[in-house]
């Protein structure tokens, strides 16, 4: 079971605005029973207090399954279908995979540690009290997902897609955010100050509700100017032809 922890609110620069910190899960897993692969995952399966260690779940179908108080360690998740699955009070450590389908899944009180994932589908998913720490995730699809109390810490996100997603109390801590897409996203109490680099491919106009550092503001200046249609030319310089 997870013990809820309350984060300490930080203070954003400018007008003394306070950003509410994300609440992190603190898992306390019960004694676990080793998972015995008797034919693989099953759609709508029920998995309670199990330890999946070095399990090869490649291509398996666990759509709609429920994982409660489980630990997945060193598992292969290539092309695994976990669509609409529920991961509750569960820890995933060192999992790897390409094309894992978690669309419309629910992740609540979950830790994802040192993962190596690519093309993971989480569109339409619900993430609540989730910690993603370490590892690298390429092309993470979070379109129209709902994220509340989510922390990305010491990880690398390459071209994550937050298009149309709703983010509330989301923190990026010592995290590389490369070519992120925020188009049509809604942000509330999103702390981006720990993202380095903070690299946005789209959606700079959706930063309302986020907190950034003065340095990040300078880094984003060219993108913001382009979004506003402002031409930046040194005094005495020649304006480009229109």
Each PLM stretch: what is its role?
Residues 2-242:
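Tandem repeat scaffolds
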